[in-house]
């Protein structure tokens, strides 16, 4: 049961094949067995079991709340959860218990979902590896997969040491690891520059970033208000659509949410015709740093659409080379503004220094924030200085408009969906990842993803195939603003063609027997 999709488990619950309590207990048991992954900061065992008990009563009375009733989910620890600690993986908020739920959390609970816990991340979601939080780095479940370990045994240069584990990507790495290791069926991440799609690609998952304004940000502790979006991590596209159907819609507590009618639920056709589609391939994304394996799979994915009658067209996004610098200026500027609220006076960490308010304020922030967060605050304050404001922040805003217009022009040229890489390569070992600083790594890892956030578009990363090392590689689809359903429909068709294989966790074979029974093989269409 643990290896099935959300949709399959929902059907099993409705048919009485398993109860919510039994399912919850299985997931809690697996969370304990996979504690070494460090995916969870807080495990809400009592809360989840109580929710499972209530769900069980509803099923017995024939009053199921829908597809999410009784389904174990996890939430990134930068979403407020009433009565459950919310830390952002920072000393600044360690011990902070919010008095309210984020809108997306409340919507999941209103649909009967079971909250298994809060997942690990980079401090305040600032990073691309899930390595810079106070609770330690998250380990990629694929580090312990049969596929990866067998490939390592074949490599004469491999040391095959347990210390050579892989990063999950970030900053939603805990959520990605939680879903990948079968401890829940869906998880919330946040996506400011790729923080949901990046770990999805590294962990063999579907990572969906909705259009800006489609899903409420209320209760998501802000990083960059103009780009932050709640993200969804699942094992298949249909599951992401189910969760999106529960989350999408206007929220009076978030003025950026759209109030136009939205087609809900997001039902995806079982058979889609892609022959009339035009798939755009941005030529600026073909960069030297892109690994040969990702480049090859990207090309074969385009050929796959073409073989089905779709038109594949090379397009230009001419301001792409400026996007990562533009993103850095705007991101750090908004970070500096948002982090100003953590002053030790209202909530969160407070230093004991009583010399003056200014001294207490400075010491609190020095103790509460790590070097990465303090560095971004300093950069942002520099860009916002009176003498720098026009040359940096205002110019970056103008470039952002040009970047957004590039996408508009591409779609207006007849393109329906853009196809790009998600990451430069597969996941790398932790010891290799930390050789470079957070800022450098983030700039590299966000190269294909952050422009989508600046343009407010929907995007989804789909696992395509395993690399020669036995690790997941993902590709990204980008859609028009608020054409999320069309985007997911195309992604579902592609997912069916490539048939990405399930992870085989050697330590968890007994628990994941369903995975082995239903194991799929990598598609020959992209690997041959």
UniProtKB/Swiss-Prot annotation:
- The broad enzyme category this protein falls into is ligase
Q: Where is this region: Disordered?
A: 147-166
| EC number(s) given by UniProt | 6.3.5.7
Q: Which reaction(s) are listed as its catalytic activity? A: L-glutamyl-tRNA(Gln) + L-glutamine + ATP + H2O = L-glutaminyl-tRNA(Gln) + L-glutamate + ADP + phosphate + H(+)
Give the UniProt entry's GO cellular component terms: glutamyl-tRNA(Gln) amidotransferase complex; mitochondrion
Catalytic residues? Answer: 76, 171, 195
Q: Which HAMAP family match?
A: GatA (MF_00120)
Q: What is this protein called?
A: Glutamyl-tRNA(Gln) amidotransferase subunit A, mitochondrial
């Amino acid at each position: 049961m643990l290896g099935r999709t959300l949709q399959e488990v929902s059907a099993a619950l409705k048919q009485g094949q398993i109860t919510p309590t039994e399912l919850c207990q299985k997931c809690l048991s697996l969370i304990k067995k996979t504690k070494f992954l460090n995916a969870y900061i807080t495990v809400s065992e009592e809360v989840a079991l109580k929710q499972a008990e209530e769900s069980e009563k509803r099923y017995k009375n024939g009053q199921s709340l829908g597809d999410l009733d009784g389904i174990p989910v996890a939430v990134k620890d930068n979403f407020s959860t009433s009565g459950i600690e919310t830390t952002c993986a920072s000393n600044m908020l360690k011990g902070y218990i919010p008095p309210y739920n984020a809108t997306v959390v409340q919507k999941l609970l209103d649909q009967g979902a079971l909250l298994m816990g809060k997942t690990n991340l980079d401090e305040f979601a600032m990073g691309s590896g899930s390595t810079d939080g106070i609770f330690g780095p998250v380990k990629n479940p694929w580090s312990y997969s049969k596929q990866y370990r067998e490939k390592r045994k074949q490599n004469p240069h491999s040391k095959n040491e347990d210390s050579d584990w892989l990063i999950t990507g970030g900053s939603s790495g805990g959520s990605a690891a939680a879903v990948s290791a079968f401890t829940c069926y869906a998880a919330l991440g946040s996506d400011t520059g790729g923080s949901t799609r990046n770990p999805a690609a590294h962990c063999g998952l579907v990572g969906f970033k909705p259009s800006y304004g489609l899903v409420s940000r209320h209760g998501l502790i802000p990083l960059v208000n103009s780009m932050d979006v709640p993200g969804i991590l699942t094992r298949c596209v249909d599951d992401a659509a189910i969760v999106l159907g529960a989350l999408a819609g206007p929220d009076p507590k978030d003025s950026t949410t759209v109030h136009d009618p939205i087609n809900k639920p997001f039902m995806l056709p079982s058979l889609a015709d892609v022959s009339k589609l035009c798939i755009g391939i941005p030529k600026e994304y073909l960069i030297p740093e892109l690994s040969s394996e990702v480049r090859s799979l990207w090309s074969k994915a385009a050929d796959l659409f073409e073989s089905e009658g779709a038109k594949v067209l090379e397009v230009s996004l001419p301001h792409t080379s400026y996007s990562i610098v533009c993103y850095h200026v705007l991101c750090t500027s908004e970070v500096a503004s948002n982090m100003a609220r953590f002053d030790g006076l209202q909530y969160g960490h407070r230093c004991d220094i009583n010399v003056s308010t200014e001294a207490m304020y400075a010491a609190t922030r020095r103790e509460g924030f790590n070097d990465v967060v303090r560095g971004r605050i300093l950069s942002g304050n520099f860009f916002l200085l009176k003498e720098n404001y026009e040359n940096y922040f205002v110019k970056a805003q103008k470039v952002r408009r040009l970047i957004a217009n590039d996408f508009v022009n591409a779609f207006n040229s007849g393109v329906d969906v853009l196809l790009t890489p998600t990451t430069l390569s597969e996941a790398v070992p932790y010891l290799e990842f930390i050789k470079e600083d957070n800022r450098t790594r983030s700039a590299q890892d966000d190269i294909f993803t952050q422009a989508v956030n600046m343009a407010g578009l929907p995007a989804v990363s789909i696992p395509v195939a395993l690399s020669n090392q036995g690790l997941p590689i993902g590709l990204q689809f980008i859609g028009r603003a608020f054409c999320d359903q069309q985007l997911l429909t195309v992604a579902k068709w592609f997912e069916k063609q490539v048939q990405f294989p399930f992870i085989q966790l050697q330590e968890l074979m007994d628990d994941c027997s369903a995975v082995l029974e239903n194991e799929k093989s990598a598609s020959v269409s992209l690997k041959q």
